[in-house]
Swiss-Prot record:
CDD domains: GIY-YIG_SLX1
Protein name: Structure-specific endonuclease subunit SLX1
Compartments in which it is found: Nucleus
Known EC number: 3.1.-.-
Domain GIY-YIG, first and last residues per copy: 23-105
GO terms for cellular component: Slx1-Slx4 complex
Gene behind the chain: SLX1
Family per record: Belongs to the SLX1 family.
Residues covered by region (Disordered): 324-354
Function: Catalytic subunit of the SLX1-SLX4 structure-specific endonuclease that resolves DNA secondary structures generated during DNA repair and recombination. Has endonuclease activity towards branched DNA substrates, introducing single-strand cuts in duplex DNA close to junctions with ss-DNA.
Cofactor: a divalent metal cation
Biological source species: Paracoccidioides lutzii (strain ATCC MYA-826 / Pb01)
Amino acid sequence: MAPSIQSLSMIHDSQECIKPIPAFSCCYLLRSCVRHASLYIGSTPDPARRLAQHNGDRYGAAKRTLRENLRPWEMVAIVSGFTSRVAALQFEWAWQNTKVSRHADLDGNATQELGVRICPRTAKEVKRVAKPRTSLTNILANLHLLLRSPYFSKWPIEVRFFSADVHRVWQVWLQRVDGLLNDGIRVVTDFAPDGISEVEGKELLAGAGRVGTLDVGYNSIKEYVEKSQFLLEDGERINCGVCKQRLILQHDIIAVCSHSSCHCAAHLSCLSSHFLKDKDSDSELVPREGTCPTCYSKLEWLTMMKEISLRLRGQAEVNRLFGRRQRAGTPKGQGLKSVRGRGHSEDENESDALQVSTGLDTVNLPPCSDGPWTIDCAIGVLGGIAHRPGGVSSGNDSDATVTPEIETHPQRCRRNQNTRTQRLGLQKSAMINLSDWYDAEVIE
């Protein structure tokens, strides 16, 4: 049966306050490269950027990581798969305060034995008194405890290790503990390549290492989002792949198969019931994965929910994903044929709005019919003129170069260099209005 949803107006009306499922959000474990006993737990949507902040390369480090005698820090493990930043913060707090968390079962042998520590280098037990809060073994034991809890065990969590010795401690602890992790929780390793020298290792650490290769955007589902838009905006009649009833695009919440060759679409409630029925589990209310009713391929529920949230309340994120940005100051008429940008802004919100270049722009005019001539000028944001020999701009890599190709007319070209220079001196904007160039004058 189709869902009894009357309208999606409430979802669309709440787009300003409800954001889509974030592309990436994780909790991380830091370890000081100088003193391995110094550890730090935090959460972030961008691990590489956050690691640079902790190491002092960018502004915004935590108070506990400001000490220069403990820098640099390395990110040894992350826990990802959270559907919101609130969920990541919730797991972060539980990981930092496992003893007082209601999700941790402290009965029996759930916690680490006092006075027992596992050496990361030799993977052997060291029976000496250690601080439980700063012990790597204790932190990994608390992580294992939370992942086995009834609350977090049903989340689509992935644990990724970047350090081999930390992963060795994790494996030793798995052999000691009685409980097992849920099959839905993935544990992967992402170590640095073998054969790296000490100098190369320091450079790799300064550049965030393997952490910098993580996909923290929606690029992994870009083709999926494009396919769903094309399928649902086609206007043809689409029937639910489960209940076979017609889908009402304006009223139903529709889930689309993530495989590129399949055109299956279904009601969200129908597909959820189909997934739970195949798993034959009465304890779960939200599925984690399932098979498509048409192509019988494996589908991840979190991936489908990301696409639905982007489609219903993430139009701004979709526009940034496909580069649909209107260039400020671009004339509607013909003339401006090529716009070339160089470099990228380091601002975190650079994709939220089109930034005005803070450098110099180089403008090149094509030759007039009377003879070859070129005016090279650099127009700054404040309207100043800086002539460069040969038309070479002295701006840095973040400068944007705008090169308009303008068709000139002989009857409108006047040979007066002084007048032309004065006209350029009155320019107050970095953007070029084509109507100002119709009266261009030839400089001989």
